[in-house]
Amino acid sequence: MIKRKITNLYDVEFVPFDNYGLPVEGMYWHKISYNKKNGGQGTYLLKMDPSAKSLPHMHTGFEEFLILEGELIDPDDKIFKKGDFVTFEPGSTHSSHTENGCLILVFMRGINQPL
């Protein structure tokens, strides 16, 4: 038996991003395989509206993401652009923002801790 799920990244429904409890303004996600109940393992699609900003957080495990559309900016002014694949190691802390909006495919290996 084949257990398979196919997700078209450009044909999904987004809900408010509430990974830390309350929704974060201007951020929306579609959980593909991400689940807090399994230790925060899995993948989700994240959409950020123009001027949206993530909450400051610490990575308890690896977080990797691929910028599909737009740009994302970290506090050190590093700009992640379309096609960039970014890896944050456990213990990394940051928050990110976008000026014009972005679409990101996120691969999680642990639950982020809000700061």
Go through the PLM ranges and name each one.
Residues 29-59, 89-93:
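Conserved short histidine dyad/triad with adjacent acidic residue
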Residues 74-94:
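Short acidic-glycine-tyrosine-enriched beta hairpin
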Residues 1-40:
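A short, N-terminal "cap"/entry segment at the start of jelly-roll beta-barrel domains
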Residues 40-41, 58-60, 78-79, 98-100:
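Short glycine/proline-enriched turns and hinge-like loops at secondary-structure junctions
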Residues 59-75:
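Glycine- and acidic-residue-biased ligand/ion/polar-headgroup-sensing regions
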Residues 49-51, 73, 109:
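Solvent-exposed residues in well-ordered beta-strands and their adjoining turns
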Residues 90-115:
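Ligand-binding loop in jelly-roll beta-barrel domains
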